Regions:
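Amphipathic alpha-helical segments of tetratricopeptide repeats
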Residues: 1, 29-39, 71-82, 114-117
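Alpha-solenoid helical repeat architecture
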Residues: 1-11, 39-50, 80-90, 122-129
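"A position-specific structural signal for the A-helix of alpha-solenoid helical repeats
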Residues: 6, 12-16, 20, 48-52, ...
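Short acidic (Asp/Glu) and glycine-rich catalytic loops that position anionic groups and cofactors
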Residues: 31-32, 50, 70, 89-92
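Short secondary-structure capping micro-motifs at structural edges
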Residues: 35-42, 53-60
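Long, ordered, amphipathic alpha-helical scaffolds
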Residues: 77-158
Length: 158
């Protein structure tokens, strides 16, 4: 029998699959299932679900509740037992990119990519970056290619 935690991990993987195929509505739908779960959900799973949902909301352009969701995610991060600086950097990044013009967004993505590159060398931060490939997504925005292309590159390197 599969316990609830493993179902929620499956939902996150399904949400990530939908994100990769640009089906952002279903990304958010499956993410919401995790957030609305009544059980005892691990906070790292909840945090990374929220980040994937922010990525989907940003990409889709259906961002009516984007700012509120960023605020709720920051509030959640502050309540986490052991949040790292990277957790707050990620949320702050989403906070600042939404209201910028495309040129300023491109600059913000480049700056954040550099920050993520440094963070990926840190043992603790590396673990955080393994849940959701935000680094790959940011890199795809910098290079102006689909995130799937970045994922394919990473798979070839392994």
């Amino acid at each position: 029998k599969i316990d609830e935690h493993h179902f929620l991990v499956l939902y996150l993987k399904i949400a990530a699959m939908f994100f990769g195929s640009k089906n952002y509505q279903n990304t958010v739908k499956y993410g919401q299932k995790i957030i609305n779960s009544k059980g005892n959900v691990q906070e790292d799973l909840l945090f990374h679900t929220r980040i994937l949902m922010l990525m989907a909301k940003f990409e889709s352009g259906f961002d009516d509740d984007y700012d509120d969701f960023v605020k709720a995610t920051m509030k959640f991060a502050k309540k986490m037992k052991n949040p790292g600086d990277l957790h707050f950097s990620i949320v702050n990044f989403f906070k600042k990119i939404n209201d910028r013009n495309p040129k300023d967004q491109a600059i913000a993505f480049k700056e954040f990519e550099k920050e993520l590159e440094i963070s990926s060398q840190n043992k603790y931060d590396k673990r955080t970056l393994m849940y959701i490939d935000i680094h790959g997504w940011v890199t795809s925005k910098v290079r102006n290619v689909d995130v799937i292309e970045i994922i394919k590159e990473k798979v070839k390197l392994k």
